[in-house]
Swiss-Prot record:
Belongs to the universal ribosomal protein uL13 family. InterPro entries: Ribosomal_uL13, Ribosomal_uL13_bac-type, Ribosomal_uL13_CS, Ribosomal_uL13_sf. This is Large ribosomal subunit protein uL13. The keyword Ribonucleoprotein applies. GO terms for biological process: negative regulation of translation; translation. Gene3D superfamilies: Ribosomal protein L13. The keyword Ribosomal protein applies. GO terms for cellular component: cytosolic large ribosomal subunit. Keywords: Ribonucleoprotein, Ribosomal protein.
Length: 141
């Protein structure tokens, strides 16, 4: 019996509106779409997921006290260079990175995960330059 390897020829584009949607709920939906876990022929060693375009990133909802309690940290590489910012500051400066950070934490951490990063396109406003790909809208429950 030969091993079945599914074809990876179907590249779908999906648009998700993030306005008023909780960040974790949005990130889990996006991560599973990028990995391709919604497909009946899901194969873990192949990248079969969709391209996901996220709109209205600045209007994403953070429940509870997470706007002030959630802290993003990064290290500059220099001594004493640990930089922190709250979720409120991050949403004000660069709202795209908040969604990207949440989604990338849910993707695999190897070579495939890094190539899956290219399938996520996040925009702060309502417009996007991917209309030529004819993306389908996806509702978040």
């Amino acid at each position: 019996m030969k091993t079945y390897i599914p074809k990876n020829d179907e590249q779908n584009w999906v648009v998700v509106d993030a306005a008023g949607v909780p960040l974790g709920r949005l990130a889990t939906l996006i991560a599973s779409r990028i990995r391709g876990k919604h497909r009946p022929d899901f194969t873990p060693n192949l990248i079969q997921g969709d391209f996901v375009v996220v709109l209205n990133a600045e209007k994403v909802a953070l429940t509870g006290n997470k706007l002030d309690g959630k802290v993003y940290t990064r290290y500059t590489g220099y001594q004493g260079g640990l930089r922190t910012e709250t979720a409120r500051e991050a949403l004000a400066k660069h709202p795209e990175r908040v969604i990207e950070h949440a989604v990338f934490g849910m993707l695999p951490k190897g070579r495939q995960g890094r190539s899956m990063h290219n399938r996520l396109k996040v925009y702060a406003g309502e417009t996007h330059p991917h209309t030529a790909q004819k993306p389908q809208t996806l509702e978040v429950r």
